Amino acid sequence: MTKLITTVKEMQHIVKAAKRSGTTIGFIPTMGALHDGHLTMVRESVSTNDITVVSVFVNPLQFGPNEDFDAYPRQIDKDLELVSEVGADIVFHPAVEDMYPGELGIDVKVGPLADVLEGAKRPGHFDGVVTVVNKLFNIVMPDYAYFGKKDAQQLAIVEQMVKDFNHAVEIIGIDIVREADGLAKSSRNVYLTEQERQEAVHLSKSLLLAQALYQDGERQSKVIIDKVTQYLESHISGRIEEVAVYSYPQLVEQHEITGRIFISLAVKFSKARLIDNIIIGAE
């Protein structure tokens, strides 16, 4: 039976007792509205750790002025049921007032890693992400924390934060979970029309095209970007917002490809903005 914890104080009390007994803690931070991608991370943690904690907290700091914090889907009862079915031990669901009891005296700024891709479109977003993850790590004190590679920029930023702040946690990146036809699973997929849902499969297919070009020896980013863009333009009605090639995890834009790279897509359909990516090349 999964236990619901709603206060920072109680969560810290449980964690301190667990640490004294040598218990390993796995942690999956989420904003709720859970889907199979989240549950894959929970299963991975359950198979590895003595205790698995899932946080469900809609973090106001990562919402911009034109993003509706109040409209973000909240379904704690459903989320609790889902993680219970896959073996999570604790759901940590604090109130905003408990996580942020007063105005923050210290702001965390991410730096260059947040100046590109999603961060460039949502100024301050990753500052909010890093602030809440930093706080959650201090509260939960996990041995392992699980993040999806679908949000690859976020994963790179969290890994850098752990290094810079000397957190005693190992970050585990979990591969993108996809539908049978290749579409990356996302809570946003429900907003697609039937036609858009049929078209959306071409995001992952365009990434496979990029991978094939790379494997055939193509190292000019512009060639890959142009061919992926042309493919998408001929297969989807949505607006292509981004096709980009960056080094990973440094997130430096690439022209002549060397080393490990991250090919990122963003497409805006009528009521849903979908992202997808592929990481390829030697580390």
Curated annotation (Swiss-Prot):
Keyword hit for Ligase: yes
Binding site residues for (R)-pantoate: 62, 154
Binding site for ATP: 31-38, 148-151, 177, 185-188
Pathway involvement of the protein, from the record: Cofactor biosynthesis; (R)-pantothenate biosynthesis; (R)-pantothenate from (R)-pantoate and beta-alanine: step 1/1
Reaction(s) catalysed (UniProt annotation): (R)-pantoate + beta-alanine + ATP = (R)-pantothenate + AMP + diphosphate + H(+)
GO annotation, biological process: pantothenate biosynthetic process
Domain of life of the source: Bacteria
Quaternary structure (record): Homodimer.
NCBIfam families on file: panC (TIGR00018)
Residues the record lists as binding beta-alanine: 62
E.C. code: 6.3.2.1
Bilayer-spanning residue ranges: none
Role played: Catalyzes the condensation of pantoate with beta-alanine in an ATP-dependent reaction via a pantoyl-adenylate intermediate.
Entry keywords, A to Z: ATP-binding, Cytoplasm, Ligase, Nucleotide-binding, Pantothenate biosynthesis
Cell compartments where the protein resides: Cytoplasm
InterPro entries, alphabetized: Pantoate_ligase, Pantoate_ligase_C, Rossmann-like_a/b/a_fold
Name of the protein in question: Pantothenate synthetase
Other comment: The reaction proceeds by a bi uni uni bi ping pong mechanism.
Active-site positions on this chain: 38
GO annotations of cellular component type: cytosol
Gene3D superfamilies found in the cross-reference section: HUPs, Pantoate-beta-alanine ligase, C-terminal domain
Gene Ontology molecular function: any one: pantoate-beta-alanine ligase activity
Family: Belongs to the pantothenate synthetase family.
PANTHER family reported in the protein's UniProt record: CYTIDYLATE KINASE/PANTOATE-BETA-ALANINE LIGASE, PANTOATE--BETA-ALANINE LIGASE
